[in-house]
């Protein structure tokens, strides 16, 4: 049984993103679909001294409609990435493992990559390495799948010889009746994640923060903590 997950690249993803990645035999970045403004594709949450806040990457959207994720460019005229780096430093510099990981994260953010997906994917790959996750990676842009939505997902599974698609539970409503998966004899299982608790600075525990929150607070224990939330059906 070859398990596959197919996910859009997101900015500083939460724990569940990496738990899903570690649960499969191959992980595909779905970077060939339409960009959704102010979605996880360009933002996520971290925990500051005053509580959780959004960090959102500014992007070029004026006069550009129906952009694919891979075609969206970052708007560097709006103080990014300095504003995000400053907030990360102010929020986490006193965390136990900040000094262990911060330089590598900041180095990627300061590279001023042109496209949104180049930055978000490079950060995700860094976090994958820091967590010691070894799942092979592929990209939908390199595979040219057929169709849209469930047809595209089934096509990606087929091209990569996967026979079990592990999907976020939120897609259950439209995947349950997918003829494309049935026709290709590809099974579907739904991934659920019970968010674990861990020692966290800046007050009362707040779940669903970016993976940086776990790394800065838990260090080498991050992967074992990540696994505590695993639950699939």
Please report, for each region that a protein language model flagged, where it lies by residue:
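Residues lining hydrophobic/aromatic ligand-binding pockets adjacent to catalytic sites
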Residues: 1-233
């Amino acid at each position: 049984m070859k398990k596959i997950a197919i996910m859009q690249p997101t900015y500083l993803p939460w724990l569940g993103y990496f738990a899903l990645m570690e649960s499969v035999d191959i992980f595909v970045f779905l970077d060939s679909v339409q960009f959704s403004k102010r979605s996880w594709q360009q933002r996520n949450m971290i925990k500051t001294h005053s509580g959780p806040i959004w960090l959102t990457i500014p992007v070029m959207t004026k006069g550009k409609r129906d952009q694919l994720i891979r075609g969206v460019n970052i708007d560097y005229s709006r103080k990014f990435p300095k504003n995000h780096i400053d907030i990360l430093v102010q929020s986490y510099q006193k965390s136990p493992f900040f000094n262990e990981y911060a330089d590598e994260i900041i180095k990627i953010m300061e590279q001023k990559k042109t496209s949104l997906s180049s930055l978000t994917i490079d950060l995700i790959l860094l976090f994958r390495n820091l967590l010691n996750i070894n799942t092979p990676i592929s990209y939908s842009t390199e595979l040219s799948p057929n169709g849209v939505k469930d047809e595209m997902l089934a096509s990606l599974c087929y091209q990569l010889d996967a026979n079990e698609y592990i999907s976020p539970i939120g897609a259950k409503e439209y995947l349950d009746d997918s003829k494309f998966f049935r026709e290709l004899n590809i099974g579907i299982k739904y991934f659920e994640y019970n968010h674990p608790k861990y020692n966290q600075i800046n007050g009362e525990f707040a779940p669903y923060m970016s993976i940086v929150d776990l790394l800065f607070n838990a260090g080498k224990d991050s992967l074992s903590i990540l696994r505590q939330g695993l639950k699939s059906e």
